[in-house]
Amino acid sequence: MNPFPLDISRIYLEPAVEEYARGREILLRFPAAERIPVASHWRIPELQDADPGDYLLAKKQALVLGVKKGLTFRPNGRSADFIAPSSSNGCAMACAYCYVARRKGHANPISTFVNIEAIGAATARHVARQGRKMVPNQVDPQAWVYDLGENGDLSVDAGISGNVRDLVALFRNLPHAKGSFATKWVNPDLLGYEPQGRTRIRMSLMPPDLARLLDIRTSPVAERIAAIPELHRAGYEIHLNFSPVVLRQGWEAEWGALFTELDDVLPAAVKDQLAAEIIMLTHNRELHEVNLLWHPKAEELLWRPDIQEEKVSESGGVNLRYRTGWKGQWLRRFKDLLASHMPYCRVRYAF
């Protein structure tokens, strides 16, 4: 198993952090780390403007502690019914295609929010206002599903503080709701959280050779697959996240091999409740330029103007996605390939 991806040597903290029990707990967990006061977790110039050559070092050594200000819920309809206020953002990993790094400077190490009680209370109130889910949808037929980790990986966050354990415990006692998060990291600590079926883990997977190039600092794909039965026995609902689907010569053969491995490893109990989401690659010009400075090999696969087209995002950024018409054909082929190897795996959504 890969070693834990953090070796915290400096902690940037907002003024109010030590007023919270969770803040004091985290500081005690990393007693040797240098403490650097900052006015806001959003504005740390030495992280935002750092040399891309230090990209991985900042992710490994830096931790930001702050107080979550906006406790808002956004409708989703894809991975979840709602995006919950996050207990963190940023990530210790460095997946070459990841959009998270566009939001807060390219390094974007983990920022952990210490006001977890307020985040949990706001979530419980929001769930109570929804009442029972009367109309089934692709997200879940009965429960309102809340994405808890839109901008990070909660399996890694669980090695920093008790925030993830607290959120799993919260949803254990919310009869009309489930928590959900995607992960590329295997953390055995999650096995002791007793989710009782009220937290859905979406295990992110791609062919191993592709992951070695693109999923930097993550758990190997074989370890992620091996962890699925254990997580299910521990009480988690397990779905699969095939994301991003990156097209290259021989993609059908390598994805077919992945589906065969899953079919061989997963027990019947997992297959009976399995569903998947499929997300075709979308890349970003700004991230492309950063990647060229630290991981140009990845850009040979991610930046493909010959089969991609530009799309301007709502925020004004220039994205590249697979060309209209072609993308639909490739997506159909992907779904057909999945169905031929894993006919029991329902596709919740694909785009």
Where are the regions a protein language model picked out?
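Flexible, acidic/Gly-rich N-terminal and inter-domain linker regions that tether
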Residues: 1-81
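Auxiliary Fe-S-binding modules of radical SAM enzymes
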Residues: 1-23, 263-351
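Conserved Radical SAM active-site core
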Residues: 64-79, 100-202
